[in-house]
Amino acid sequence: LKKFNNFSKIRVKNFNAHKSFFKKYKELFITPRIFEKVKTNFLAYPIIIRENNYFSRKDLQIYLEKNNIQTRPIFSGNILRHPAFNKLITSRNKLNGFPNSDYIMKNGILIGCHQGLSVKNIKYIHDIIYKFIKKLD
């Protein structure tokens, strides 16, 4: 707990750096909304690839990983599709499906913003994503 306040400050700083960077690319990515009076210590920064783009989550994920940037899918899929949820899901929900959850599963990715990342690391992540986007032109 002694390190918590410092870790929290670093995570918020890294989160805000990502937020500032991705603000320039609203047409490509959906980014998190933060609500007033809610304090979150993000371990990772979620981004969702918008529909009708020239690339997929997989394309971006492979590019980042090839450039030594670790990524994760948002969650590990649509948890509502797990067999354990079969009895909890109503037939109405099965009929309508879970399009938003499926979309996030297919198009969502997490990039780091934890306290282990330095300003230099965050800048590197942004530089690599910028290069990826420029390759689309």
Regions found by a protein language model. Give the residues of each.
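PLP-dependent aminotransferase class I/II
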Residues: 1-137
